[in-house]
């Protein structure tokens, strides 16, 4: 093989490796708190802002309410706990809710119920969420 052909082959190989490395860096993480952070909305019109400091704010339309709280993450499981609310919120929604989460793509967040007794929260959380 001539020197020119070798250089060309190495350049192509280097470019392919570089593309693979860059593509690997752009994948969406599948667990941990960073997966959840952002502002999300669902088909019910609920807006859920999840902050990196372990706090969140929810603005719901049905029932119309503002909810603030904290969350903890273990792997792909999140526990949410309301700390303050305004508007009509059922009494059984004062305890924690536990959900498994996944990121089907970069702009979608999905939850599956593990343990929760708050029906409005279950109805909202288990909807597909889209990054705002």
Short names for language-model regions:
Residues 21-24:
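C-terminal motif of bacterial Sec signal peptides marking the signal peptidase cleavage site
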Residues 26-41, 48-51, 130-132:
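N-terminal helix-cap/turn-to-beta initiation motif at the start of protein domains
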Residues 3-14:
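Bacterial N-terminal signal peptides that target proteins for export
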Residues 16-19:
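Short, linear, compositionally biased motifs with a strong N-terminal bias
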Residues 27-29, 110-132:
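Edge beta-strand at a domain terminus
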Residues 42-43, 47, 58-117:
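Contiguous, well-ordered beta-strand patches that form the walls/edges
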